[in-house]
Amino acid sequence: MKAIYILSVLLLMMLPILSRFATSEGAAQHVEPIQKIRVEQNDCTRGIRCPRGHYCDPGLRQCLPR
């Protein structure tokens, strides 16, 4: 009986940590910095040249075909 009580207390202590990873909001927080890095690497306004026949759109920060 004492073991069940200890396990239930441990589970209640771990619940906020586990729920942070279970929600989509928490998962999005972990993925978001990776997406920001990719946008910055492909950002043509920071010195990356666009291929021939493309132009740099400063609003989208991407190379677009002409």
From Swiss-Prot:
Q: What residue range is the signal peptide?
A: 1-19
Q: Which UniProt keywords apply?
A: Disulfide bond, Secreted, Signal, Toxin
A Gene Ontology molecular function term for this protein is: toxin activity
Give compartment(s): Secreted
Q: What modifications does the entry list under PTM / processing?
A: Contains 2 disulfide bonds.
Reply yes or no: does the keyword Transmembrane helix apply.
no
Tissue localization of expression is:
Expressed by the venom gland.
Its GO CC terms?
extracellular region
Q: Which family does it belong to?
A: Belongs to the scoloptoxin-04 family.
Q: What is this protein called?
A: U-scoloptoxin(04)-Sm2a
